[in-house]
Amino acid sequence: MKADILQHKLVPEHTILSEEEAQKVLDDLNVRLDQIPKILPTDPVVKAIDAKVGDILKITRKSETAGIFVAYRVVRD
């Protein structure tokens, strides 16, 4: 029996951005793709959501101090 890691309370929501959404994030943050922090293709959540190398993930987590915190990661080695 496998556990669904996406349902664990400590795993924040991960969303794969479309190409249009990814370009908007890069433009809004005024950064290049290689300036976005990485997440490895071997990460369990990356595997669970079937993200591919080059995808940008939006990670949304709840924070007691910030309310909701959004981070972006690009899948790469």
Curated annotation (Swiss-Prot):
Primary location group? cytoplasm
Gene source species: Methanosphaera stadtmanae (strain ATCC 43021 / DSM 3091 / JCM 11832 / MCB-3)
Where is this protein localized, as stated in its record? Cytoplasm
Drop me one GO molecular function for this one. DNA binding
Q: Which GO terms describe its biological process?
A: transcription by RNA polymerase II; transcription elongation by RNA polymerase I; tRNA transcription by RNA polymerase III
Function field: DNA-dependent RNA polymerase (RNAP) catalyzes the transcription of DNA into RNA using the four ribonucleoside triphosphates as substrates.
Q: What is the lineage of its organism?
A: Archaea, Methanobacteriati, Methanobacteriota, Methanomada group, Methanobacteria
- Which EC number(s) are documented for this chain? 2.7.7.6
- Name of the molecule in the record: DNA-directed RNA polymerase subunit Rpo5
Q: Which pairs of positions does the record mark as disulfide bonds? A: none
The record's listing under SUPFAM superfamilies reads: RPB5-like RNA polymerase subunit
The UniProt catalytic activity note for this protein reads: RNA(n) + a ribonucleoside 5'-triphosphate = RNA(n+1) + diphosphate
Q: For this UniProt entry, which segments traverse the membrane?
A: none
What NCBIfam families does its record include? Answer: PRK09570.1 (NF007129)
What keywords are annotated for this sequence in UniProt? Cytoplasm, DNA-directed RNA polymerase, Nucleotidyltransferase, Transcription, Transferase
CC per GO annotation: cytoplasm; DNA-directed RNA polymerase complex
Q: Which family does it belong to?
A: Belongs to the archaeal Rpo5/eukaryotic RPB5 RNA polymerase subunit family.
Record's keyword annotation contains rRNA-binding: no
Q: How does it assemble?
A: Part of the RNA polymerase complex.
